[in-house]
């Protein structure tokens, strides 16, 4: 990736002209040879993900999609400097999708509006995109008509010049000047016509183009980035022919915002060759698919656990706490942690935990330890007998457990840093580690 980015950086920085000032500026070009490998990688990961999802029932698929949409909404907003409450977003999505057993948190009207836009786009991915619809979505982002304390135009294309700037007053740096407001209607008509066409282009390239094209027109006074990410996701949904969305690019963009804006800026100063942008977009999507794999593994492991434990009588507090840890909360299960998270006394936490030990739901990590910690028993059977060549490896700042399952299936699952650390110290047994991350393999 670095060689491609470096070379295109040198080429694009040589031009100061904004891309929309070129004749026929939307006749975008790209080097198919340089994109071939990354596009094949994305296609392979998409196939693997949907292959795994085939084993999920409808309810589990819905929960997986809800989790993905939660982080899509949260991180797409955070890219623009808007922080949303994750629990409120999750609750709003769960309620709208009819998902039960989700902690109910009253979302604000604003969060409900933002969630409604995302779900509208997901449900109507195969419908024509119109000016009226996209204007309504933009208006939903700004129900008060204000953005950061300033009144803006909502529900309509902008009528003012739009400069993308950074820096303090008096030392502003102009990164991009969008097409004049007189051009916006015509430019958007051209974009919408292309968006609704059946042009035979690789779906990832098409999604990347939509994102870049839309933010380059910058049709609204605010909300353009979030809308661009929604539109690019819609095109991926059309290619998948599914309203079930299990991966999103926003969480990865949020981790690499500076790079995101830098590459957009270079392409917007370029001559129409957007190879660098497409490559970065596809590579970011590839990482997003890895994240989706982790979410699916977590859901499958959780599903496997509850299949085994569904008949065990538990209090609501015990169920809530188990679900919290099953969803990947990064902490040791101790009476102190339990009391803090469940907002109960330490004595109550000790009773809760001991009851779960007696019911074979939890086991002590190190029997007789002075400060005991516990692991969830996903499977009463010792599953280590099914695995060989087990290693814990670190790649790109993440820890992975790698193994061979039943002598034929290679397994690679990302694990929490705390679990990797505890395993290395001997505080976490291999049996518990494999059970936590690989129990889904036992689903018949």
What are these regions (language model features)?
Residues 1-400, 412, 429-436, 440, ...:
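FIC/Doc superfamily catalytic core
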Residues 404-422:
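Acidic, low-complexity, intrinsically disordered interaction modules
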């Amino acid at each position: 990736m670095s060689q491609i980015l470096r070379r295109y950086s040198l080429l694009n920085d040589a031009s100061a002209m904004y891309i929309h000032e070129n004749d026929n500026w939307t006749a975008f070009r790209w080097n198919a040879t340089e994109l071939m490998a990354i596009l094949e990688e994305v296609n392979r990961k998409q196939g693997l993900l949907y292959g795994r999802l085939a084993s999920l029932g409808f309810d589990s698929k819905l929960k997986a999609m809800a989790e993905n949409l939660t982080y899509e909404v949260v991180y797409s907003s955070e890219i623009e400097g808007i922080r949303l409450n994750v629990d409120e977003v999750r609750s709003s999505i769960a309620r709208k999708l009819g998902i039960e057993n989700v902690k109910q948190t009253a979302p604000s009207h604003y969060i409900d509006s933002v969630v409604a836009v995302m779900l509208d786009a997901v449900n109507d991915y195969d419908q024509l995109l119109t000016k009226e619809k996209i204007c309504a979505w933009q208006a939903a982002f700004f129900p008060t008509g204000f953005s950061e304390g300033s009144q803006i135009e909502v529900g309509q294309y902008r009528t003012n010049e739009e400069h993308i700037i950074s820096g303090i007053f008096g030392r502003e740096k102009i990164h991009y000047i969008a097409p004049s407001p007189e051009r916006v209607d015509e430019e958007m008509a051209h974009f919408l016509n292309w968006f609704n066409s059946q042009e035979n282009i690789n779906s990832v390239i098409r999604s990347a183009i939509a994102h870049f094209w839309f933010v380059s027109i910058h049709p609204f006074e605010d909300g353009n980035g979030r809308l661009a990410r929604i539109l690019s996701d819609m095109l991926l949904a059309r290619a998948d022919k599914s309203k079930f969305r299990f991966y999103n690019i926003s969480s990865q963009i949020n981790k690499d915002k500076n790079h995101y804006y830098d590459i957009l800026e270079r392409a917007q100063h370029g001559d129409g060759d957007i190879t660098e942008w497409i490559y970065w977009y596809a590579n970011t999507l590839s990482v997003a698919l890895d994240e989706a794999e982790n979410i699916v593994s977590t859901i499958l492991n959780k599903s496997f656990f509850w299949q085994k434990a569904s008949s065990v009588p538990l209090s609501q507090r015990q169920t809530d706490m188990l679900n919290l840890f099953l969803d990947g909360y990064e902490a040791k299960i101790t009476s102190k942690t339990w009391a803090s998270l469940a907002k109960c006394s330490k004595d109550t936490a000790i009773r809760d935990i001991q009851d779960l030990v007696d019911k074979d739901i939890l086991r002590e990590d190190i029997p007789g330890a002075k400060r005991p910690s516990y692991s969830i028993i996903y499977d009463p059977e010792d599953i280590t007998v099914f695995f060989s060549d087990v290693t814990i490896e670190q790649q790109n700042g993440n820890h992975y457990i790698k193994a061979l399952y039943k002598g034929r299936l290679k397994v690679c699952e990302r694990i929490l840093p705390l679990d990797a650390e505890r395993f290395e110290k001997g505080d976490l047994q291999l049996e518990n580690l494999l059970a936590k991350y690989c129990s889904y393999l036992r689903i018949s």
